[in-house]
Curated annotation (Swiss-Prot):
The gene is MYC. GO terms for molecular function: core promoter sequence-specific DNA binding; DNA binding; DNA-binding transcription activator activity, RNA polymerase II-specific; DNA-binding transcription factor activity, RNA polymerase II-specific; DNA-binding transcription factor binding; DNA-binding transcription repressor activity, RNA polymerase II-specific; E-box binding; identical protein binding. It comes from Bos taurus (Bovine). This is Myc proto-oncogene protein. SMART domains: HLH (SM00353). Glycans are attached at T58. There is a cross-link at K52, K143, K148, K298 (Glycyl lysine isopeptide (Lys-Gly) (interchain with G-Cter in SUMO2)). A motif (9aaTAD) lies at residues 100-108. Residues 413-434 are annotated as: Leucine-zipper. GO terms for biological process: cellular response to hypoxia; cellular response to UV; cellular response to xenobiotic stimulus; chromatin remodeling; chromosome organization; DNA damage response; ERK1 and ERK2 cascade; G1/S transition of mitotic cell cycle. Residues 354-406 form the bHLH domain.
Amino acid sequence: MPLNVSFANKNYDLDYDSVQPYFYCDEEENFYHQQQQSELQPPAPSEDIWKKFELLPTPPLSPSRRSGLCSPSYVAVASFSPRGDDDGGGGSFSSADQLEMVTELLGGDMVNQSFICDPDDETLIKNIIIQDCMWSGFSAAAKLVSEKLASYQAARKDGGSPSPARGHGGCSTSSLYLQDLSAAASECIDPSVVFPYPLNDSSSPKPCASPDSTAFSPSSDSLLSSAESSPRASPEPLALHEETPPTTSSDSEEEQEDEEEIDVVSVEKRQPPAKRSESGSPSAGSHSKPPHSPLVLKRCHVSTHQHNYAAPPSTRKDYPAAKRAKLDSGRVLKQISNNRKCASPRSSDTEENDKRRTHNVLERQRRNELKRSFFALRDQIPELENNEKAPKVVILKKATAYILSVQAEQQKLKSEIDVLQKRREQLKLKLEQIRNSCA
C-alpha cells in the first residue's frame, strides 16, 4: 500500500482520476487499522497537536496540484468512507462509488443545501468558525470534509436508500464523531454575538450559493485575494458581502484616493473572522487559482500611495519656497538691524561726545584744584613762597622737609612747656611756704 502513495506523489502530473482510487483505498485501510486499535473511537478535533499548530502563511497561498493530492481533506474523506464491521469482511465501497461520493461532496448542490442551509447543522458551522482562530487550516479542512460525509450518509440513510455495504461499525463511528463535535461546539462562542446577520437565512438564496458563484464574486476575492475557492459557502463572508457592495474596476478608478483608503480600512476591520474561517478550509477539489479582483490591485495601489504620501513630490517644491521666505525674512531683519546700527552710531557718538565733554570738564576741574593745592602748599613753604615757577616735585620735597622741621620744633617746644610747667609748680609751692612763714 505505501507503494501506491509514493507512486501518486511522484507521478503528480498524471491524470487525477487514475491516481485517486489508489490513494483512497490506502488511506482507508490505514485509518481503520488505527481505529480498531483505539476501540472504534475517532480522534478528537484537537488530538493531533502537530496538525493543530501547523499554521498557514498569511495571506494563505493556493495549494498546488501536488500538495492537493496529499491534503488532509482527502485523508479525512478516505477515513470516513463507510466500510463493513470490525472483521472487515465484504463491506467496502468500490472506487467508482468513492469517486461519486467525492464529486457529489465537492460540487453537488444537494450536499451544499443539506449541509450548509440545514438548521440542524448550525452548531457544526459555529464550531468550525469559532475554533478556527489559530489558522489551523489542515485540521479544519479535515474536520469539514468528515462532517460533510457524516451528514451526507445520515441524509441517505433517512431517505430510504442506504448503502447495502455499510455496516454497524461505520454508523457508530459517525455518530460518536458527531457527538464529539456537538460537545465541542457547545463550549464555543455563538457567532450570532459577533456577526449581526443570521447564519441561516432561508428567504435569501445568497448564503446557499454554489462554490462557483462564491469563488468568482468580487467581494469574496477582495476578502481572500490569494486563497482558493472553498466548497463551504459560509454565511459570514456573505454577510460582509451584503454590507460592502462589490466595487468594479470602473468605479474604483473614479473614486478618490482618500475614499479608497477608508474602504480598505473598513474591509480590514470587518474581515478577520471571515478570513480565518475561509483560510482555515482550503478546498481539495479546486486546483486553479481564482482571478485577482480589482480591489486587490487597488490595495497595492493604496499601499504605494501611502508610501508616496509619506514623502510626496509636491512638498519637495514647497521646501525652496519656505527657504526663500526664510531668506527674505532674514534679509528684512538684517536690513532693520543695519538701519538700527546706522542710526545708533550717530546717537552713540553724541552720547560719547557728551560723556567726553563732561569727563573733560571734570578733569579740568580736578587739575585746577590740584594746581591750587600745589600753589597753596608752595605758599606755605618759606623757601618757595615767591617762586611761582617751582615745579610740583620741588614743592612736594620742600613741603616734606618743611613739615619735618616744623614737627621737630614742635617737639622742642613741647619739652620746654613741660619744663616750664614744672617750674611753675615749684614756684607755687615756695610761695605758699613763704606765706605760711609770714603769717
